[in-house]
């Protein structure tokens, strides 16, 4: 398992379900996909569900 999975990231913008945007993890911006069926708002804390390449798959906490 990737050591980043389970960590907390912060959404840098509003993300509708399955949308791609940015999230900050450990002070670094990452590409992020909302893996949830609900929207994520800018500034919302999210859990990293999985990592594919340089893309975080996040869900709201």
What role is predicted for each listed range?
Residues 2-61:
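Terminal membrane-proximal soluble interaction domains of membrane-associated proteins
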């Amino acid at each position: 398992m990737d050591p980043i999975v389970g960590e907390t990231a912060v959404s840098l913008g509003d993300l509708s379900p399955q949308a791609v945007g940015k999230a900050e993890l450990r002070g670094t911006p990452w590409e992020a996909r909302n893996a949830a069926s609900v929207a994520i708002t800018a500034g919302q804390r999210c859990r990293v569900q999985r990592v594919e390449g340089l893309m975080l798959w996040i869900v709201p906490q």
